[in-house]
Curated annotation (Swiss-Prot):
Its main location: cytoplasm. One of its GO terms (molecular function) is unfolded protein binding. Gene3D superfamilies: GroES chaperonin. Disulfide bonds: none annotated. HAMAP family: CH10. It comes from Alkaliphilus metalliredigens (strain QYMF). It comes from the Bacteria. The lineage of its organism: Bacteria, Bacillati, Bacillota, Clostridia, Peptostreptococcales. This is Co-chaperonin GroES.
Length: 94
């Protein structure tokens, strides 16, 4: 099953947080930070959203940094994704 976002929406898959600190301390699940890095897996067509022309600047495969608590988390075929607006993407990592 595929997710096809509408308008200015983007579907991302989060990159998991590290299990250990740089000094080698193992972190329990509750101590890990909410990941803010992800890979873009689907991009909406853009168009006119709330009266403004939106041109999509992202493409599938981009590595991005996004707002910490942005978007809606969904589970599909056992995989977790986040759907958010292109505005919630802060940067593309090259």
């Amino acid at each position: 099953m595929n997710i096809k976002p509408l308008g200015d929406k983007v579907v991302i898959k989060k990159v998991e947080a590290e299990d250990k600190t740089k000094s080698g301390i193992v972190l329990p699940g509750s101590a890990k930070e909410q990941p803010q890095m992800a890979e873009v897996v689907a991009v909406g067509p853009g168009g006119v959203v709330e009266g403004k022309e939106i041109i999509m600047e992202l493409k599938v495969g981009d590595k991005v940094i996004f707002s910490k608590y942005a978007g809606t988390e969904v589970k599909l075929d056992g995989e977790e994704y986040t759907i958010l607006r292109q505005n919630d993407i802060l940067a593309v990592v090259e």
